[in-house]
Structure formats: C-alpha cells, structure tokens
Swiss-Prot record:
Its cofactor is Zn(2+). Its EC number is 6.1.1.7. It comes from Fervidobacterium nodosum (strain ATCC 35602 / DSM 5306 / Rt17-B1). The keyword Amino-acid biosynthesis does not apply. It holds the Pfam family tRNA_SAD. This is Alanine--tRNA ligase. Zn(2+) binds at residues 558, 562, 660, 664.
Length: 867
C-alpha cells in the first residue's frame, strides 16, 4: 500500500468526488447555524436544513472536508489512538440525487483504486435489516463473511442533536492485524473485537427525520451523508496505529517537545500529556479563530475546559508558566494553507490563549495541592469539593475526572452538576436585576472603610464617596434617589460568608438614606446601596443606625448555624462538612455532606443538642489568630473561603470552633429556641436543613397550635384523637371512592360505545369521550371494546383536574399503527404527554378545551393524514 500525506489524502478525496459531479465547498464554521448544537460535530451539520427538506439544495451533490469539534469523550483523548476533540471529516453528500448504489460503489472505488488499500484488509458492516446494502456490497465482490450485519446501536446514524435527519448506515473497516481478544469459538470480525478493525468511512443513508419525541418520519427526499475521518485514514495510509503518529500531529508534538523540553515516546505517562496537548491546541486554535472566546457559559466554557485541561497536562510535564500559546504556531504552519482563517487570526488566537493561561496557571498549582489534600483525607472527590474547585479555582470537571481516573479516586459528577445548575440559576436571577455591585470604579480609590459592627449598631461617620448612576459625585439630592455611599466607619455588615447584609438608615443634616444592601466590591471598601430622600455631601458627618431587630435575628441564626454544624457531626458523624449556608433574619439554611435523608429520630436528636447548648447560655467568644494556629487548634475552615494570614475564630466553649467573619450573639441563651422546619436533598451526597430561631420559632409553634385548635373544632375531637379521626375519615373516603368507581363501571356500557364504530380502508376504530372514569376502569373498558370491534380504540376521560388518554391497537394492526405513538400525539394536543407499547398506551393532559381537536387528530392518524 502506498504512502500518502494527510494533505494528499484530503485533496484526493475532494478531487475524486468533484469528478463524480460533486460541488467542492469549503469547511463551514465550527459555530453551527443551529440552536440545538454547540458546535459543528459532523460533516453533515451545515446541510441539516437541506436534509430536513426545509431548504432546497443549490447543488444536488456536494463534497467537503469539514472541521469538527466534539468533547463528549474528552477523558479518552490522549489515552487512546483515535479519540480527538478536533478532527477533520471528509464527506460526500447527495440531496435527493443518488442513493445507496452509487454511494457504496464510489466509496469502494476510492478506497481500493485511489488509496489502493488491499481488498483483503477491508471489511464492511451494514444495518442488520438493510438487505439492499448487503447485496450491493456482495455484488462488488466483498466476501459474505466480510459483510457484517450489526444492530441499530452500531449501524443507525443520527441525528446530530436531539432532532434531525438520520438513517441506516454502512461502514468500511481496515484490518490492522493487531492481536486482540476474540470470543471463544469465534473468528475475529468488526462486530466481536475492539481495536483491530478501524472504521475509516461511514456511509449514512439518510431517509428519516427524528422528532423531539424520538419518532421517525420519512424525509421528502432520500439523501446520502458520508463521513470519513481524515486522521484515521492518514494513520492507515502512513502505516501507523496511533493517529498521533501521523503527519497531522508530528509537527505539533515536535513543538511541544521543544517548548516544554520533553521527549515523546520516552515515558508512557508523559506521552499521554503530550498527546492531550497536541489534540487540544488544535481545538483551541480553531475555536478561537471561529469566534469562540473563553467564558463560563456555552461554547466559551467548552473552550475554557479544553484549554485548561491542556494547561494541566503541561504542568504535569513541568510547565511553570504559559506555554500553550507558543504551540499555536505549529498548528497554523501545518493547517493554515487549508484553513486560512487560522493564519489571519494567529496573533489574536495566541493572545487569547496566553491571557487565559495567565489567569489559570497559578490557581491550577494551588488547586492541585488542594486536590491532593482532599484525596489524602477522604480518598475521593465529593460533589462539594468538585464544585468548590470549579468555583474558586476554575477547575473544569474534566480535570478532576482525569485526576480521579489516573489515581482510582471516586468523583461525584452528578452532585457537581446539581451544584452547577444551582449556581446558574442564581446567576440568571442576578442578571435580571440592576447591577450596582460591579467592581469597576472601586479599584484603586485609595480609601478604606473600618467596620465597627461587631461592637455597635450605631456610629458617627464621614462620607468618603457618593455614587449615582455609576458616577462619583460630590453631593446628591433627590426623593427616593438610588445611590451608593462609602463611609470611613460603618456598623453595617456587608454580605459575605452566607450572611445577608444589614439594613437600616444613614442620617445626614438634610437627608435620610435608607440602606437596602451592603457589599464589599474590593478588599477594604464597604458600599451601602439604597435610596436617598433629601441631601448628602462628601465629607459630611452622618449618623449610621443598623436595623437592630433584623441584625439581632441574623446574629441568632448565624450562631445557631455554627451550633447546628457541630450537632450534625455529633449525631451523623465526622464526615459531615458544610456545603453551603444562608443566614437571614427570618431563617437559616445549611447544606452539608451526608449520604442519606435524616430520620425523624436524628432530627429530634439534633434539635435537642442545639437547644441544650442554647439553654446552657454559653458565652460566644471571638479571637483573632494566625490561620495556622487556628487550624492546628481544631477550628473548622470552609473550603470556599479565602483566608489571610490572620483569621477571626468564633468559639462556643468546646462545642464549636469555626473561622468566621460574621456577626454572632454574645451568649447562646440569646438564641432563645431552635426549630428545624425542613430537611431535604440538594444533590447526591448533600443534604439541606432549614431552621428558625427566637421569635420566629415561637411564631412557628403558635401557628401549629392554631392549626390544631381549628382541627379540634372541625373534627369535634380532642387534640390526642385528631390523627385517629383523620385516618378514619380518609379510610371512609377511600371506600366511598371505590364504591363510586364500581357504580361507574356498571353504568358504562361497552356495547353502546362499540356501536360508534367507524371504518377507514377496512380499519375499524372507535373514539369516545367519557366523564370521570379512572385509569383501571378505562383499561378494562378499552379491552372489551377493542375485542368487540376488532379494531383501534381511543378513550378520553375528563377528570376534575386532568384528562386521561387510553389507546388500544390490536396486535395484527401494529405494523401500521402504534398505540404509544398515537397516545403521544393526542396527549400533546391536550397539553400533556405519555406513551406505552405498540398495542396499549396511556397518557395525560390538562387542556379540556382541546378535546375536540384531539379526537380530530386521532381520526387523521387513522386515515394516514398525520404520521
């Protein structure tokens, strides 16, 4: 077999299909014109509207070499011969022009005549029910033993997203001859081995469209969509097993060797890192050139993940400063002639990469140290730890997955995703509000606010800065004028560490400023946001007054949170760690690591312990200590917090000791009463407790007492008999409902419903709308009616708060009609959903006004007017 470079293969492919009447088109952008896709993941993506029949093709035949990005198997990149995040897909496409015969014949011709691959090295696969494709391959001379029938999982392609064109496919494999395990008593084939037979070309016979519910619909025209991986073909044509050993990667790997002073193929572990960098730098280069920029959402986050994963592997190879931007040039030199956009954008790409590396490399080193401490302590990476590493140090989950895989650690990815979604939700809410809290304008002001709120709720201060509509002014005047003040001294606590900000008032000589929110945009500055009525000026003396009731309620809840944390560890075990908290005047919310829901007994024990500490009226002591000293003494530090050399320690005798900058009561007795109001799951391995203290607890108990009093009057029973009385009423209700349903069952006459039978093309069917019939009765009823008419039945039951749809299709009619699909379509009209088997299905809905429309749709389905 002759040797061919990747450039020669690419050109040979495109030229071959040009000669077959195909229009050669340039690669489309990696950013698809498709809201369902993050990136262009296959050669056919730019042509999806044509395959759908939504757009008429300009050319009936097209050939391309499409740049693609996929990151779904990113953890395998560098560890296997053929996984990549960026790759080039050669493709030839037919839009209602030729179909299977030509597609198969031309593919075989190109592989055997142009590439001159030995026929004895080639195998093919077909979809198990595609006899047409099987016969075409056989007539081309492929031995029957080398034509492998494979399942839908292997040989039915698409769609490239939740919806889109799809169809059966046929693949061409190259036999590398590599020794691999084979099932006992079987000869090796592409179906029963892994790693020996390399798929080099996939021919997709696109003839269906898959909708959002997974249903297949015939396309207006049959199409051909093929994909041949340039990297894989290059490996075969260059006589190597690993794609990374082809000329597509060699120049990039050489650049990595030079920049990082390492040698490829000298150390298996280092080789993985070199291959990861070689792959990822291609993705990064092309993504940025196509307009993707690093961010924390969408495509930008995918780019950031890939870039940071490459950076992590560089650090493993000894990199201590940015290096990836230096390797971009090797990608441009290798691929710039084919993709001129990366030549034009080279400088821009390098600057973006370097900037991103500078942001992350210091955090990476610190984060890796923390990961090591975590796994040394627990032997696993919890969802909480994973999220904190992501949130604090920018660690993508891929990096943690790599670390876990390399070292055999457990990683809670599902829990991490839950944390991430919660953060996104908070972010979405915050974006809808007016953003005063931007750092812009507060850096380098050369001023500082002294917080005195630990000791007093009132202070005399001077106004240092006034900000209105984002601009600093010398004075402000108005009614309900939104503005921000910075004081030299303040008793107002700025939101931090889970504790909400104080509220209150700031009084000037001629004005009153109502404090609604307090925050610290940069270290040392506290900003008061609120509304001004009257006048206020810079350098004016003002009186600050924190809302005492709210502050003291918050203090009670904050100290109670610390006590709760320790109580949880005593009752549940030392594995309990804080995973998040919120301290407000009205309640506290505490998230913690634990593997299961708390029992009623555990909740009672926790409440009792907390209340015992409260009743003992233990002094709450705060001290300033060095971080090392505090941790050495056993003070609990929170992973997400960034601590300085000296920290504030809040101690409740020997019961609780934590690093905390929040406000607390002087004595646990001030908390009054502690009551847990809910316990729930946040994510895998993380639970949440919500609780109240002080007067809020008393009000909670008073509300319960009032409820009991009402129940006593309604049930005419003493408090001790209320539960028994309710149980008796519920049992009576249940029995009455059974009696009602039995009466309904007897009143409904299946024979009368069966008389409504209609017929279309020898298919008998009945549709009937009933009132308040339960699902189990509907099932018996529909079986009876279907047996009577030997046909299809749709029953719709209007309940008080919902609609029940039941469909029955005789087995002999399921080739043309599917009960599950009918139920889905009908219930969708009714604003619901559901499904079932081809013979029986039930679904639900809620739009009673749409019942007529639903029955009309059913009749259209019977008449084949709707698929």
């Amino acid at each position: 077999m002759k040797f061919m470079t990747s450039d020669e293969i690419r050109e040979a492919y495109l030229s071959f299909f040009e000669k077959k009447g195909h229009k050669r088109l340039p690669s489309a952008s990696l950013i698809p014109d498709d809201p369902q896709l993050m990136f262009t993941v296959a050669g056919m993506v730019p042509f999806k509207p044509i395959f759908w029949g939504k757009v008429d093709p300009v050319y009936p035949r097209v050939t391309t070499c499409q740049k693609c990005v996929r990151t779904n198997d990113i953890e395998n990149v560098g560890r296997t011969p053929r996984h990549h995040t960026f790759f080039e897909m050669l493709g030839n496409f037919s839009f209602g022009d030729y179909f299977k015969q030509e597609a198969i014949e031309w593919a075989w011709e190109f592989v055997t005549k142009v590439l001159e691959m030995p026929e004895e090295k080639l195998w093919v696969s077909v979809y198990e029910y595609d006899d047409e494709a099987y016969e075409i391959w056989r007539k081309l001379g492929v031995p029957e033993r080398k034509i492998v029938r494979m399942s839908k999982e292997d040989n039915f392609w698409g769609p490239a997203g939740p919806t889109g064109p799809c169809g059966p496919c046929s693949e061409i494999f190259y036999d590398t001859g590599v020794e691999v395990p084979v099932p006992e008593g079987q000869d090796p084939t592409p179906a029963n081995t892994d790693g020996r037979y390399i798929e080099i070309w996939n021919l997709v016979f696109t003839e269906f469209y898959q909708d959002e519910e997974g249903n297949l619909h015939p396309l207006p025209r049959k199409n051909i969509d093929t994909g041949a991986g340039l990297e894989r073909i290059s490996a075969m044509m260059q006589g190597v097993y690993w794609n990374f050993d082809t000329d597509l990667f060699k120049p990039i790997i050489e650049s990595i060797e030079n920049v990082l002073k390492v040698s490829y193929k000298s150390d298996k572990v280092k080789d993985v890192s070199i291959r990861v960098i070689a792959d990822h730098v291609r993705s990064v280069t092309f993504m940025i050139a196509d307009g993707v920029l690093p961010s924390n959402e969408g495509r930008g986050y995918v780019l950031r993940r890939v870039l940071r994963r490459a950076l992590r592997h560089g650090v493993l190879l000894g990199a201590k400063e940015p290096f990836l931007y230096k390797i971009v040039d090797s990608v441009v030199q290798k691929m710039g002639k084919i993709y001129p956009e990366i030549v034009e954008k080279q400088s821009f790409v390098e600057n973006i990469v370097k900037s991103e590396e500078l942001k992350f490399i210091n955090n990476l080193s610190r984060g890796l140290e923390i990961v090591q401490k975590i796994v040394t302590t627990s032997g696993k990476i919890s969802a909480e730890d994973a999220f904190k590493l992501y949130d604090t140090y920018g660690f993508p989950i891929d990096i943690l997955r790599d670390i876990a895989t390399e070292n055999g650690y457990e990683l809670d990815e599902k829990g991490f995703e839950k944390y991430l979604e919660e953060q996104r939700e908070r972010s979405r809410k915050a974006q809808g509000e007016v953003e005063f809290a931007q750092k812009t304008g507060y850096e380098n002001l050369g001023i500082e606010t002294v917080f005195v709120g630990y000791d007093t709720l009132v202070s005399e201060s001077s106004v240092l800065k006034i900000r209105v509509n984002g601009e600093f002014v010398e004075k402000a005047e108005g009614n309900d004028l939104e503005c921000e003040l910075i004081l030299d001294i303040t008793p107002f606590y700025a939101e931090k560490g889970g504790q909400v900000a104080d509220t209150g008032v700031i009084k000037s000589q001629d004005g009153l400023f109502t404090v609604e929110y307090v925050y610290s945009p940069v270290e040392g500055i506290i900003v008061h946001r609120g509304k001004l009525n009257g006048k206020i000026s810079v350098n004016e003396k003002v009186q600050s007054q924190v809302d005492e009731i709210k502050r003291k309620s918050t203090m009670r809840n904050h100290t109670a949170t610390h006590i709760l944390h320790s109580a949880l560890r005593k009752v549940l075990g030392s594995h309990v760690r804080q995973a998040g908290s919120l301290v407000e005047p009205t309640r506290l919310r505490f998230d913690f690591t634990h593997y299961q829901a708390l029992t009623k007994d555990e909740i009672t024990k926790i409440e009792n312990i907390v209340n015992e500490v409260i009743l003992k009226a233990i002094p709450v002591v705060t001290e300033i200590k060095s971080y090392d000293e505090a941790v050495k003494e056993g003070a609990m530090a929170l992973f997400e917090e960034k601590y300085g050399d000296f920290v504030r320690v809040v101690k409740v005798s020997d019961f609780s000791e934590e690093l905390c900058g929040g406000t607390h009561v002087k004595n646990t007795g001030e908390i009054g009463l502690f009551k847990i109001v809910s316990e729930s799951a946040v994510s895998a391995g993380v639970r949440r407790i919500e609780a109240i203290t002080g007067l809020n607890s008393l009000e909670y108990l008073r509300t319960d007492e009032e409820l009991f009093e009402k129940l006593k009057l309604l049930l005419e029973a003493p408090k001790s008999e209320i539960v028994e009385k309710i149980q008796k009423i519920l049992e009576e209700k249940k029995n009455l409902e059974k009696e009602i349903q039995e009466i309904k069952r007897k009143l409904i006459n299946p024979e009368e419903i069966a008389k409504k039978v209609k017929e279309y093309n020898n298919i008998k069917y009945v549709v009937s709308v009933l009132e308040d019939v339960e699902p189990d009765i509907l099932k018996d009823l529909i079986d009876n009616i279907s047996d009577r008419i030997k046909g299809i039945v749709l029953l719709i039951s209007k309940m008080s708060d919902k609609i029940i749809v039941t469909v029955k299709v005789p087995k002999e009619l399921t080739q043309d009609y599917n009960a599950g699909n009918i139920a889905k379509l009908v219930s969708k009209v009714l604003g619901g959903g559901g499904g079932g088997s081809p013979t029986f299905a039930q679904a639900g809905g809620k739009l009673i006004e749409k019942i007529d429309e639903a029955t009309e749709l059913f009749e259209k389905i019977i008449r084949k007017e709707v698929q």
